[in-house]
Amino acid sequence: MKKKILSIVALVFVAIFALQVIALAAQSSGISPLNNNVLSSFTDFSISKTGNSEVDVNYTGYPNITTGATITVTIKKNTFLFFWSEVVNETYVVVGEKYRNTYSYDLSSHGPGKYRCNVTYTISGSGGADDVIPFEKDASY
């Protein structure tokens, strides 16, 4: 009876170890999904000491395939623990296979604290379904 219990416990430990290895391998593969209409994108969010924030947006599509994008920028302020208050919500519609811009927002009227920026690109074109690319970053001042 003891051998049977020990065998079952050992089997459970081996299974748990194997699943952790599989999960770790899947997590750190670094493989990016293939996009239909966009070759690359870059986004960044920063806030100066005076409360001026900048959101850098940049995408490069495929020639004769990418037609444009809808870029949604949302900035929220952490008000208490896990509660967030939206302070910026802007949507920009752009045309073309490439786009680069820096959006500036004055957050000083909302006071110092922790802010979270979410940017969502919805990039359209003839390459297939729209590509949806999310971005999230926290910054404080």
Q: Which residues does each predicted region cover?
A:
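Sec-dependent signal peptide cleavage junction
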Residues: L19-N36
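Solvent-exposed serine/threonine-rich low-complexity stretches and specific carbohydrate-binding patches
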Residues: V73, W84-K98
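Short beta-strand segments and strand-loop junctions that repeat across beta-rich extracellular domains
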Residues: T70-F83, N118
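Bacterial N-terminal signal peptides
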Residues: A10-Q20
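Positively charged n-region of N-terminal signal peptides that target proteins for export
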Residues: M1-I5
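Surface-exposed, short loops/turns at beta-strand junctions within beta-sandwich domains
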Residues: Y99, Y105-K114
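Short beta-strand elements
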Residues: G127-Y141
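Short, surface-exposed binding/anchoring microloops in extracellular/periplasmic proteins
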Residues: N36-I75
